[in-house]
């Protein structure tokens, strides 16, 4: 798995390409990712990089967190994330090193992972794109009802996984193969074509596309 970075969704805008076409882009701010721990096969049984980014008020840091950051010799960040490493990947990266947006300079497409916007409790029409029932012709109470949820005496139960009303959104979502439009190393910005999961200011994990 290729090394990724943690970023923050700034918002969406558009830019014009060389042909004058309008391209919708999402602006992702990727401040320096500081390496807090290097997982190895010998000590942990797998290879990975643990990173942090951003800042956190001193009075919001727990004692275990403070000790962990102090041991790594890096400034406390707003969270900790791990990136699994393939064999031979990430060699030479040590604790305290900084990873910046310029690692995407030669990358054409990326996968972006974030937490989707929460929608609360929603019905089947919004949650699963069910069709509405008749507006008239005898229907007076079930316009947005889900309809039948099963059979009769056989099997006599509702199958697991049946699409019904319930909580929608606020789950981990990955959007794959987003084209990298621009890498602005001076301002720590990455511009990708299209939308990415989550709300403005939400944390994102950006990795080179696995299906590119």
Curated annotation (Swiss-Prot):
- GO BP, one example? translation
Can you summarize the PTM annotation of this record? Methylated by PrmB.
Which domain of life does this protein belong to? Bacteria
Coiled-coil-forming residues are none
Record flagged with keyword Ribonucleoprotein: yes
Keywords for this entry?
Methylation, Ribonucleoprotein, Ribosomal protein, RNA-binding, rRNA-binding
* Pfam families tied to this protein: Ribosomal_L3
An example GO CC term for this entry is: cytosolic large ribosomal subunit
Entry GO MF terms:
rRNA binding; structural constituent of ribosome
**Positions bearing N5-methylglutamine:** 153
Among NCBIfam families, the record links this protein to: L3_bact
Record function comment: One of the primary rRNA binding proteins, it binds directly near the 3'-end of the 23S rRNA, where it nucleates assembly of the 50S subunit.
Q: Which family does it belong to?
A: Belongs to the universal ribosomal protein uL3 family.
Record text on subunit structure and interactions: Part of the 50S ribosomal subunit. Forms a cluster with proteins L14 and L19.
Q: Supply the name of the protein.
A: Large ribosomal subunit protein uL3
